Amino acid sequence: MPTFNQLIRHGREEKRRTDRTRALDKCPQKLGACLRVSTRTPKKPNSALRKIAKVRLSNRHDIFAYIPGEGHNLQEHSQVLIRGGRVKDLPGVKFHCIRGVKDLMGIPGRRRGRSKYGAEKPKSI
């Protein structure tokens, strides 16, 4: 515990906040190219095959990004737009691919939450 005089002389050092999405370079989104598309199993209580892509961003960072939604058309060398946002049950996956932009198609026929999956408005009957 510092004395009052020590605090006057030196003050307290502020804690530095760490950036969770350092690969984005303070940008809201970044463009990248797929190096590999694969599946990964989640952490302990959950069970699935989550679709992920290894992406090289335009600033030369290599990251893993989650591909949301059912089905996708990504393959090697596809261009994708990446945003921040981790996947809680996949360690090391701290980014999401944005559907409906560049080479990653939106989900056809989706009616709810369309904006999150790049789906077009359905034709009214």
From Swiss-Prot:
GO terms, biological process: translation
Key words, A-Z: Mitochondrion, Ribonucleoprotein, Ribosomal protein
Family named by the database record: Belongs to the universal ribosomal protein uS12 family.
GO molecular-function terms, A-Z: structural constituent of ribosome
HAMAP family assigned to the protein according to its UniProt record, in alphabetical order: Ribosomal_uS12_B
Xref: Gene3D superfamilies: Nucleic acid-binding proteins
Lineage, broadest ranks: Eukaryota, Viridiplantae, Streptophyta, Embryophyta, Tracheophyta
Gene Ontology, cellular component aspect: mitochondrion; small ribosomal subunit
Classification via Pfam families: Ribosom_S12_S23 (PF00164)
Role according to the record: Protein S12 is involved in the translation initiation step.
SUPFAM superfamilies to which the protein is assigned, alphabetical: Nucleic acid-binding proteins
Compartment(s) of residence: Mitochondrion
Keyword presence, Ribosomal protein: yes
Protein name as catalogued: Small ribosomal subunit protein uS12m
